[in-house]
């Protein structure tokens, strides 16, 4: 394990304290008998079959690749061209998933959470969601320390260690902080969780998506990402806000990137 720098310790300490405050508020709401977040009254929309097939195919392919890969293999370090290609692919896939959902054949578009009329509240809930995930994620991450090596960390973080130029950093920010949250929240929360919730109880749908989301990120990262996925799933289930879960995910990825830079 690398030495933790003073700026990183300050950032983690500040976020940890804020996270404990959020959990204190959550505990207070639970003791009062109220919901942590009031549930949405929006009807559950139907997921367009094209979007559902694309997501199920992608997830199946990812899980098959992980299952066939030797557990001892380290994470492949991409180069800048790989990151640029990843950004292009992510943007194209995002549009391919989004367009069927908002097409004229889908009258229930608002139920997917794309309504921004109350964007300030949605964004603030995303910030609170991020703060709420800090302590559980750190606790889960600490259990994986014996299995962590320099080659097991995310490929983009390894690239940053080899090439810390502003150009590389800009592309990594675009890939990890902007495009990855947009695409993954559309895939896992908006499409997969909504689709599952129409055929299974809400709690089981949330749990299943959280397991899949964590699994596709492979070990050891899957362990700390599981509580993050549970929180993201709960946020989306209660608010049905795409902006809320994207803000939470963006802040999480941005924090990981900032810690790597520090």
Question: What name fits each language-model region?
Answer:
Residues 203-262:
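Functionally important transmembrane alpha-helices
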Residues 118-125, 183-207, 237-241:
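Membrane-interface helix/loop boundary segments of multi-pass membrane proteins
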Residues 182-187, 191-192, 219, 251-255:
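Active-site His/Glu-centered metal-binding helix of metallohydrolases
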Residues 65-89, 99-180, 198:
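Juxtamembrane helix-loop-helix connectors linking adjacent transmembrane helices
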Residues 88-93, 174, 223-227, 231:
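Membrane-embedded alpha-helical segments of multi-pass membrane proteins
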Residues 55-66, 133-138, 210-218, 251-258:
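Aromatic-anchored segments of alpha-helical transmembrane domains
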Residues 1-111, 116, 121, 254-262:
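N-terminal, membrane-interfacial amphipathic/helix-forming hydrophobic leader that caps
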Residues 109, 189, 193, 229-233:
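Interfacial helix-capping/hinge residues at the ends of transmembrane alpha-helices
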């Amino acid at each position: 394990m690398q030495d933790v720098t003073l700026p990183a310790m300050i950032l983690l300490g500040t976020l940890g304290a804020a996270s404990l405050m959020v959990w204190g508020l959550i505990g207070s709401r639970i003791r009062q008998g109220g919901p942590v977040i009031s549930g949405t009254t929006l009807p559950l929309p139907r997921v367009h079959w094209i979007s559902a097939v694309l997501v199920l195919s992608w997830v199946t392919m990812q899980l098959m690749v992980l299952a066939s890969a030797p557990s001892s293999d380290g994470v492949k370090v991409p180069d800048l061209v790989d990151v640029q290609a990843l950004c292009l692919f992510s943007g194209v896939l995002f549009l391919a998933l989004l367009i069927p959902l908002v097409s004229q054949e889908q009258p229930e578009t608002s139920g997917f959470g794309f309504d921004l009329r109350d964007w300030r509240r949605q964004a603030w809930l995303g910030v609170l969601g991020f703060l709420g995930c800090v302590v559980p994620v750190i606790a889960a991450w600490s259990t994986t320390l014996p299995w962590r090596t320099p080659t097991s960390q995310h490929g983009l973080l390894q690239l940053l260690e080899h090439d810390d130029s502003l150009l590389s950093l800009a592309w990594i920010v675009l890939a990890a902080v902007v495009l990855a949250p947009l695409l993954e929240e559309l895939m896992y929360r908006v499409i997969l969780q909504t689709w599952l919730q129409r055929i299974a109880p809400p709690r089981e749908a949330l749990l299943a998506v959280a397991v899949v989301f964590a699994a596709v990120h492979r070990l050891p990262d899957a362990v700390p990402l599981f509580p993050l996925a549970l929180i993201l799933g709960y946020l989306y289930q209660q608010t049905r806000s795409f902006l809320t879960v994207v803000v939470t995910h963006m802040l999480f990825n941005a924090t990981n990137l900032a810690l790597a830079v520090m």
